[in-house]
A protein has these predicted regions:
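Short beta-strand/loop segment that forms part of the nucleotide-sugar
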Residues: 7-19, 41-42
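A conserved acidic beta->alpha catalytic loop
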Residues: 17-25, 72-73
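Alpha-helical bilayer-embedded segments of polytopic membrane proteins, i.e.
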Residues: 193-207
Length: 207
């Protein structure tokens, strides 16, 4: 539906399979056979969200690149508005953030809010509370992100660090269309530690 609305835009769709154990790879192969605009990358095992983001960005070829989760918690219907903003308003990047956490467990909401408060208190790079990875970027920003050579990447911090002009769009949290999240509390904790160590000098000062 979104692609029909944006008829003047040539799309390429890149799906990244992060070592899934279900039928994801087969579905991606079928999509590729039916529509040459659909491409896919498949990891040999689960390397994590950051590796998937980097691989997808590196494989992209377009002048504009959107990052989006396939669970539809990132509403595709925002894409036309995001694209129009980049055409008219002089921004390099349209990012999104949730203004509610409807459907999310309270303990997870509390820990997420605490993380953002803590990391922003000790970091020179602002990481917006509720920020999603869902965004539309111009090619020059994509190239700058790819040139960041961190081994343990933290994209939410990198997007702010590279310094391009950003427009924020807000939306209410949307529950997953299917399946369950694979983000356990332990994985979230490890990801938070990577974010803190990657974008502040405080942990090094305390060591």
């Amino acid at each position: 539906r979104v692609m029909d609305e944006m008829k003047d835009v040539v799309f390429e769709l890149i799906f990244v399979d992060d070592g899934s154990s279900d039928a994801t790879l087969g579905i991606m192969k079928d999509l590729n056979e039916k529509d040459s605009r659909c491409r896919y990358l498949s990891f040999s095992r689960n390397f994590g969200k950051e590796a998937a983001i980097y691989a997808g960005l590196k494989a992209s070829e377009g002048d504009y690149v959107a990052l989006m989760d396939v669970d539809l918690q990132d509403p595709p219907t925002l894409l036309p508005e995001m694209y129009e903003i980049l055409q008219e308003d002089g921004y390099d990047n349209v990012a999104t953030k949730r203004v509610t956490r409807t459907g999310e467990p309270r303990i997870r909401s509390f820990l997420s809010e605490s993380f953002y408060k803590f990391v922003n208190a000790i970091s020179k790079t602002e990481i917006v509370d509720g920020a999603r990875d869902y965004r539309l970027m111009k090619r020059k920003m994509v190239q700058a992100v790819l040139e960041m050579s961190e081994y343990n990447r933290f994209s939410k911090g990198i997007f702010g660090w590279v310094g391009f002009r950003t427009k924020w769009l807000q939306y209410d949290n949307i529950e997953r269309s299917a399946g369950k999240t694979k983000w356990s509390m332990w994985k979230l904790f490890k990801y938070s530690v990577e974010g803190i160590t990657g974008f502040s000098v405080a942990p090094l000062s305390l060591a």
